[in-house]
From Swiss-Prot:
Tagged with keyword Ligase: yes
Catalytic activity: N(1)-(5-phospho-beta-D-ribosyl)glycinamide + formate + ATP = N(2)-formyl-N(1)-(5-phospho-beta-D-ribosyl)glycinamide + ADP + phosphate + H(+)
Protein name, UniProt field: Formate-dependent phosphoribosylglycinamide formyltransferase
PROSITE patterns linked: ATP_GRASP
Pathway the protein takes part in: Purine metabolism; IMP biosynthesis via de novo pathway; N(2)-formyl-N(1)-(5-phospho-D-ribosyl)glycinamide from N(1)-(5-phospho-D-ribosyl)glycinamide (formate route): step 1/1
Domain of life of the native organism: Bacteria
Gene: purT
Protein function: Involved in the de novo purine biosynthesis. Catalyzes the transfer of formate to 5-phospho-ribosyl-glycinamide (GAR), producing 5-phospho-ribosyl-N-formylglycinamide (FGAR). Formate is provided by PurU via hydrolysis of 10-formyl-tetrahydrofolate.
SUPFAM superfamilies xrefs: Glutathione synthetase ATP-binding domain-like (SSF56059), PreATP-grasp domain (SSF52440), Rudiment single hybrid motif (SSF51246)
Organism: Paracidovorax citrulli (strain AAC00-1) (Acidovorax citrulli)
Length: 414
């Protein structure tokens, strides 16, 4: 199937609009630029990282259906690419159904993955995939009842994990070890949710050995059919639900790897179905899984590049961002690994506007390393402001070098 791309800022332009313009969106935009695509970066605040590199920058409340509709109808992009969850997804479905725009991977996928309830019910109840035991709760009292089993269903018990139904980067997530933690966890979830839903998911704790992200790509083959391919598994470490380092490849037993791929294929095949039921959805998905021995449990999925996948900037022939850009444009993809590597997060360390970074030269002196400083206009002590990536002959060396490089970067108030 021949693919034609135009010239930016001309009548022939191929136009892509990103809804959400953080550090991951910024890398997608750069990948699209390299393919000659005209880009529009949308976010809720001015000077978001992706807006700094796009042809056009727009600032709206993306959860407002009227604002979202007006912008898409005015700009008329060929593709709309959601990069965050807090979007008026029913409006995207309406616009897609009307033929106004094509949503990546589909408007249905954007709706189902906008919060943890939609995707968990799809995975566990519709597809029958293995997950942790879970319940959705609308109050601290319901949360306590779900943990104790006094709601007429099997007890979730302690330890358990509570998360807002909509949040990002671990915000509002906590582990509960006993009854004294319940009210604190509820309050923390309410403060950390991206949109005020007043609803949480409580999950029974799985005694896993490690967790992975399996980047899964749905892309057009030469005959026009959509084929699924997988990157090598990415291991990662989280603190309070927030990724702090990742590495690739994560060694896995063959049976566990096959089960992980089967789960990822099942959920992405379903999310790839459009409103008409056709398997038309294209793009990259980040599928999060828990692993213990040969056992694998589904955790979450994002229909877009994943923060732990920043490591692919150092490891793959095509990073997750290049894979996403190619897949959504109908171009061939290559998920092969080039070399082992790792990533380590650089936190802001200070609450300030327009921070400066010292130690960049020292960081880049570490062998095989590179940096991404995201350009976020405002820093917080625990806000992710950059990442160090490292390539090496083995994962352990790459992890050590990525941590060393990240530690040498010193953000400060300018």
């Amino acid at each position: 199937m021949p693919i034609t791309l135009g010239t930016p800022l001309s009548p022939s332009a191929t136009k892509v609009m990103l809804l959400g313009s953080g550090e991951l969106g910024k890398e997608v935009l750069i990948a699209l630029h390299r393919l000659g695509v005209e880009t529009t970066a949308v976010d809720r605040y001015d000077n978001a990282p992706g807006q700094q590199v796009a042809h056009h920058a727009r600032t709206i409340t993306m959860s407002d259906p009227a604002q979202l509709k007006a912008l898409i109808e005015a700009e008329r992009p060929h593709l709309v690419v959601p990069e965050i969850e807090a979007i008026a997804t029913p409006m995207l479905e309406e616009l897609e159904a009307a033929g106004t725009v094509r949503v990546i991977p589909t408007a249905r996928a954007a709706r189902l993955t906008m919060d943890r309830e939609g995707i968990r019910r799809l995975a566990a109840e519709t597809l029958g995939l293995p997950t942790s035991p879970y319940r959705f709760c609308d109050s601290a009292e319901e949360l306590q009842a779900a943990i104790d089993g006094t709601d007429g269903q099997p007890a979730i018990g302690f330890p358990c994990v509570v998360k807002p139904v909509m949040s990002s980067s671990g915000k509002g997530q906590s582990k509960l070890d006993g009854p004294a933690d319940v009210q604190k966890a509820w309050d923390y979830a309410m403060a950390g949710g991206r949109v005020s839903h007043g609803r949480v998911i409580v999950e029974g704790f799985i005694d896993f050995e490690y967790e992975i992200t399996l980047l899964t790509v749905r892309a057009r083959a030469a005959d026009g059919s959509i084929q699924t391919s997988f990157c090598e598994p990415i291991g990662h470490k989280q603190v309070s639900g927030d990724y702090v380092e990742s590495w690739q490849p994560q060694p896995m037993p063959p049976l566990a790897l096959q089960r992980a791929r089967d789960i990822a294929r099942a959920v992405t095949d379903d999310l790839g179905r459009g409103l008409d039921g056709q398997p038309s959805g294209q793009g990259l998905f980040g599928v999060e899984l828990f692993v213990k021995g040969d056992e694998v449990w589904f955790s979450e999925v994002s229909p877009r590049p994943h923060d732990t996948g920043l490591v692919t900037l150092a490891t793959q022939h095509q990073s997750e961002f290049e894979l996403h850009a190619r897949a959504i444009l109908g171009l061939p993809v290559d998920t092969s690994l080039r070399n082992p590597g790792a990533s380590a997060v650089i936190y802001g360390g200070v609450d300030a506007q327009g921070i400066a970074f010292d130690g960049v030269d020292e960081a880049l002196a570490v062998p095989g390393t590179d940096l991404r400083l995201f350009g976020k206009p405002e820093s917080f002590a625990r806000r992710r402001m950059g990442v160090a990536v490292a390539r090496a002959d083995d994962v352990d060396t790459a992890r050590a070098n990525a941590r060393l490089a990240a530690g040498r970067v010193r953000p400060r108030a300018a």
